[in-house]
Amino acid sequence: MDLETGTGKVLPVYIEEEMQKSYIDYAMSVIVQRALPDVRDGLKPVHRRILYAMQEAGMASNKPYKKSARIVGEVLGKYHPHGDISVYDAIVRLAQNFSTRYLMVDGHGNFGSVDGDSAAAMRYTEVRMAKVAEVMLEDIEKETVDFVPNYDESLKEPSVLPAKVPALLINGSAGIAVGMATNIPPHNLSEVVDGLIMLIDNSDIEIPELMTAIKGPDFPTGATILGTEGIRSAYTTGRGIVKIRAQAEIEPMQKGKHRIVVTEIPYQVNKARLIESIAQLVKDGVIEGITDLRDESDRRGMRIVVELRNDVVPDVILNQLYKHTKLQDSFGIIMLALVDGHPRVLNLKEILVHYLNHQKEVITRRTRYELGKAKDRAHILEGLKIALDNLDAVINTIRSSANADIAKTALVEKFTLSLRQAQAILDMRLQRLTGLERKKIDDEYIDVMETIDWLESVLADEQKVLNIIKEDLLEMKKKFGDARRTILSHDTSSMDMEDLIAEEDIVITISHQGYIKRQTLDNFRNQKRGGVGKTGGSGKKNDDCAEHLFLSTTHHNILFFTNKGRVYRQKGYEIPEAGRTAKGTAIINLLPIEQGEKITAVIPVKEFKTEQYMFMATDKGTVKKTNLEDFNSARKVGLIAITLDENEQLIGVELTDGNSEIILATRNGIAIRFDEQDVRPMGRTAHGVRG
């Protein structure tokens, strides 16, 4: 063997080239033959082979169930040379009402659960085709699609199904190929049909108009989609992310208690793991106030019950569950499908257009097939009519012939018939020689000729093809259409900490030495005129005192003004809570104030209204009025509230309505009073005017 010339049975190759070629072959095999659906029928090869094998095995929806192992064997042996587990898993998903929006397989037995339980072994479960699967294969015998050789070229299998329903959208698809993935959500059949009809009526329709019919995904598990931005992005670009939130209600119980009842969870969320995660959050102290957690789901539907203490706000607990568990989840949409054997990311209109083009080809091929059959029948009927018109001569010709072949040849020569017509005459029963039977032949011939005219007109007019598609779609909508399960909410409900905190009245205290704390108003109670009050001390030592004390709520904004003219912003709930006698937290640990910077004013603000103002005064007698709305952008790192001269300090700030009377007083007992309107509003960084 000469390795240099390549003679013999071994050829030298570069391993880099061979690895590149082999990997590309493998990648394309996964992309085209396993992981991605065809845009026309919405099926991956394994699903297409399962449905076709079930039809070939006579497993129609009105026939008895057959063992799942039987169809797995049919698929493996004839069409799909892969593992039996992968085929059975695909069958199981087609039969799970929590995985597939419109079931393709009617399963009998244990096919798993939303808790993540596996289906029973294939030797125990039984299956047959669902009605939707039957219409996917309807007219396949009429040469509507191309057939290709199977893996060993011993049989033929369809390269695509006729797909009378748009399966890619109504059931969606998910798959991971090499270097790409698809994740198409299921949709409501009635809405998709309405969108297709809109496209048939107006081929120039834009995606926003289509979205008036196809409003968004419709998951088999229901739940609620938050916002439309992710849907709009997916429909226009082929990619988007939608947030799905569980359907939950708060129900009252005895003794002022409440419970949260979850009846629908996001798509593809494991219910058992969801409940485990809630229990773990309670155990870890992340969520407090839950006294009982149980799963009351049964054949009537899902029901997860979360019982709460009577001293918690149910909405807050529910928001915490949304925040920390899969009760709120995201679904990343990637509308990737095979178009002419090549993977493409498609928008909503492109998917609908490709489906309609496929249906036009199916209808056209079916019409050609039916036209050929009709012409064949007309040809036979013409021969029978000739025979009946010359009945005596035909009978004599047949009687005088020695055998059937001679009789056939004689009929062809004497009456100018084709061999098929002559054979039909010989096959005709004597009862058809009666007058009534002759009329039936004449009537059938008229009907067949009308059918031929109609079929030819369909082939000549694309609008008639579209009308047929429209009629078929409306029939599918009437037969399989149902109400939307997933609720679409225009409220994006982007959750922040405030959603998770109950709004309650609080008392905020800042001491002279710069310690701050928050207490609930429940720590204080009304006392009569002679009451001695309660200790609200700042620790064990009595060397500190309260300098600022005011009422607010956990949701209010607290603006901290310093002597250096800066302002800092915190939410009420962000201030650390402490007991009545506790010292509190050093304010330098809460706010990024500089050395020598002190809090001189604290203003609680519910809303930043344009008709309210911050009125400021400095130790040099400068005053300034600034619109409250200018402080709405206040960041935790602080903003300039007033520009100060050297050695000047901000000493006071008050919230006004713009029409107040202002009094400035000095330590020497001199005061001035003036109308606030005498001071014009200035920007945040302005210095102010002489007071």
Feature annotation, model-predicted:
Residues 1-243, 303-305, 529-538, 543, ...:
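Catalytic phosphate-handling regions of large nucleic-acid enzymes and associated NTPases
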Residues 6-11, 182-691:
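C-terminal interaction appendages of subunits in large macromolecular complexes
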